Curated annotation (Swiss-Prot):
Name of the protein: Macoilin
A GO CC annotation given for this chain: nucleus
Extent of Polar residues compositional bias: 320-348
Record organism: Homo sapiens (Human)
Family designation: Belongs to the macoilin family.
Length: 664
């Protein structure tokens, strides 16, 4: 009997298990595990008086910091730590303690259940409701049993760290959307260039491509689509069909496959032939410089974290390289799909390799004739863009200079007005000081006059009292004198009548009384003179009271002058602020002017380098004439000839077999 080998690839299929019971048992076990973990953590919190669930976000934060340091560098990790610390401090200061603990615990348990494989379903929602109910009904009010000061920073971290991660997620989402938009724009441009390339092909190849498209559409309409068909964003391509294709298409497919692997490693979309390596090295340098300038423009518009900036640079560089090299690679729809990332099956790959080995190398010459001019045509675009940028920068420079001149004129006018205002302020200050001195002297004189008036009024009252008292005494003396005279007359008459004695004593008494009367009259005259002087002083004081009204007028004038000086000081401070703003604007304009000049110098240097490299490439490029004797297709006329190349003073040999750069 013959010995038979078993086919290891055809293994016996295992028996089908009941997935319904498996899912039920697995989900119930999973949710029971969640409940057990939750109960254990709550028990540990109650026993040890610490919220252990707050340590889980802290552990996530440490892991994210380690990952950012490992994959994105120290600068981004430090920035991430600073942002998270700031968010934690804000939550710690501005959120009340009870609401902080409630939100932190609720978020931790909801996020823990959310990380399961089930997603949003009835058990997860029920667990969320249970957690929220327990936190709101029981633990929201019982904060006395815990170390509040120790748990509060961790609770703030449980809220601040998710806010930071949500912010970074939103930023990455926005950058992803912008990147998709850019990819769509590049895809449209590639399709446009693909159509141009298809229209530039000879009519025979166009007919072959039309037949291939019809066959592809027919293959798409079949119901039995195999798993070997790969879907791409530009269209699906069947990988298992066997059609008679020409040699250029097969070569483009093979080159697209080989270069697609390199593009995944280096993020470059350039697929060149092995024959064009010395020529394409210079072309790649020019395209790299153009892509570097375009990536700078995109980086100015899309400001973000370092990770997203690097991703956007690589994405824009790959898309621009793909667009510039589309003339070399994308000459058929199959090569276009291969460069965009679709990979054919192994059977079609072996078939294409066998066909490629059997064909002649004449098709490489045709490809060179079709590829080189399209790359050469894209070279002046960089110079045109750089010249446009230089014109824009020169216009900005002139505008900034005009603004600088206007600002300088405004500063000079403001400085002159400031000098005038300062002189006026000095005069007003001197006048104000004089008025204040006068006012001070007037106030002092007024106080002294008030004191003198009060003293004189007291003296006047005393003099009036003394006068009234003296008048009373005088009246009494007159009455007494009259009585004495009457009694004396009676006594004289009686003495004359009765006796002629005691005449001398009476005469002496009369003399004394007359002397006293004279003294009293003299005192009366003195008192009257004093009363007249006091009345004159009272009149003078009344006149002074009338003069006080003039001092009030001076006070009102002084207050008006003070208001005016305050207004002038405010206007002077406002003008100084405007002057400072103008100086800051002048500094900004100078800085922008220096930046623009630096950019102009950089652009001039780049233009010189590009012109030098283009001259070297054109000097190295010989005139291409190839014979197509063995090719069944008609030769394609080249789109570029070395006769149209401008003569440059380069010292390179255009007829050299291998390009060798000059040694300096």
């Amino acid at each position: 009997m013959k010995r038979r080998n078993a086919d290891c690839s055809k293994l016996r299929r295992p028996l089908k298990r009941n997935r319904i019971t498996e899912g039920i048992y697995g989900s119930t076990f999973l949710y029971l595990k969640f409940l057990v973990v939750w109960a254990l953590v709550l028990l540990a919190d109650f026993v040890l008086e610490f919220r252990f669930e707050y340590l889980w976000p802290f552990w996530l934060f440490i892991r994210s910091v380690y990952d950012s340091f490992r994959y994105q560098g120290l600068a981004f990790s430090v920035f991430f730590v600073c942002v998270a610390f700031t968010s934690n401090i804000i939550c710690l200061l501005f959120i009340p303690i009870q609401w902080l603990f409630f939100a932190a615990s609720t978020y931790v348990w909801v996020q823990y259940v959310w990380h399961t494989e089930r997603g949003v379903c009835l058990p997860t929602v029920s667990l969320w409701i249970l957690f929220v109910y327990i936190e709101a009904a029981i633990r929201f009010k019982d904060l006395k049993n815990f170390h509040v000061d120790l748990c509060r920073p961790f609770a703030a971290h449980c809220i601040g760290y998710p806010v930071v991660t949500l912010g970074f997620g939103f930023k990455s989402y926005v950058s992803y959307k912008m990147r998709l938009r850019k990819q769509k724009e590049v895809q449209k441009e590639n399709e446009f260039y693909m159509q141009l390339l298809q229209q530039a092909l000879p009519p025979e190849q166009q007919m072959l491509q039309k037949q291939e498209k019809e066959a592809e559409e027919a293959a798409k309409g079949l119901p039995d689509m195999d798993s070997s068909i790969l879907i791409h964003h530009n269209g699906g391509i069947p990988a298992n069909k066997k059609l008679s294709t020409t040699l250029p298409e097969i070569e483009y497919r093979e080159k697209g496959k080989e270069k697609d692997k390199d593009a995944k490693k280096h993020n470059l979309g350039i697929n060149n032939n092995n024959i064009l390596q010395p020529v394409d090295s210079k072309i790649q340098e020019i395209e790299y410089m153009e892509n570097h300038i375009n990536s700078k423009r995109l980086n100015n518009d899309l400001v973000g974290s370092t990770e997203n900036l690097l991703k956007e640079d690589s994405c824009t560089a790959s898309s621009k390289n793909y667009k510039n090299a589309s003339g070399v690679v994308n000459s058929s729809p199959r090569s276009h799909s291969a460069t965009n990332g679709s990979i054919p099956s192994s059977s079609s790959k072996n078939e294409k390799k066998q066909k490629c080995t059997s064909k002649s190398p004449s098709t490489h010459k045709d490809l060179m004739e079709n590829c080189i001019p399209n790359n050469q045509l894209s070279k002046p675009d960089a110079l045109v863009r750089l010249e446009q940028d230089i014109k824009k920068l020169k216009a900005d420079l002139q505008a900034s200079r005009q603004v600088e001149q206007e600002l300088r004129s405004q500063i000079s006018s403001l400085s002159s007005t400031e000098r005038g205002i300062r002189s006026e302020m000095g005069q007003l200050r001197q006048e104000n000081e004089l008025l204040q001195n006068k006012l001070h002297n007037a106030v002092q004189m007024k106080q002294k006059d008030k004191q003198n008036i009060s003293q004189l009024e007291k003296k006047l009252k005393a003099e009036q009292e003394a006068r009234s008292f003296v008048e009373k005494q005088l009246m009494e003396e007159k009455k007494r004198k009259k009585l004495e005279e009457a009694t004396a007359a009676r006594a004289v008459a009686f003495a004359a009548a009765s006796r002629g004695e005691c005449t001398e004593t009476l005469r002496n008494r009369i003399r004394e009384l007359e002397a006293e009367g004279k003294k009293l009259t003299m005192d009366m005259k003195v008192k009257e003179d004093q009363i007249r002087e006091l009345e004159l002083k009272v009149q003078e004081l009344r006149k002074y009271k009338e003069n006080e009204k003039d001092t009030e007028v001076l006070m009102s004038a002084l207050s008006a002058m003070q208001d005016k000086t305050q207004h002038l000081e405010n206007s002077l401070s406002a003008e100084t602020r405007i002057k400072l703003d103008l100086f800051s604007a002048l500094g900004d304009a100078k800085r922008q002017l220096e930046i623009a000049q630096g950019q102009i110098l950089q652009k001039d240097q780049e233009i010189k380098d590009l012109k030098q490299k283009i001259a070297e490439v054109m000097a190295v490029m010989p005139s291409i004439t190839y014979s197509a004797a063995t090719s069944p297709l008609s030769p394609v006329s080249p789109h570029y000839s070395s006769k149209f190349v401008e003569t440059s003073p380069s010292g390179l040999d255009p007829n050299a077999s291998v390009y060798q750069p000059l040694k300096k």
